[in-house]
């Protein structure tokens, strides 16, 4: 999922 402009799994 994407959070605060940083894509993370």
Swiss-Prot record:
The modification Phenylalanine amide is found at residue 9. It comes from the Eukaryota. Limited to neuronal cell bodies, neuronal processes and sinus gland. Keywords: Amidation, Neuropeptide, Secreted. This is Peptide tyrosine phenylalanine 3. May act as a neurotransmitter, neuromodulator or neurohormone. It is found in: Secreted. One of its GO terms (cellular component) is extracellular region. The keyword Cytoplasm does not apply. It comes from Penaeus monodon (Giant tiger prawn). Belongs to the NPY family. GO terms for biological process: neuropeptide signaling pathway.
């Amino acid at each position: 999922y994407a959070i605060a402009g940083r894509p993370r799994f």
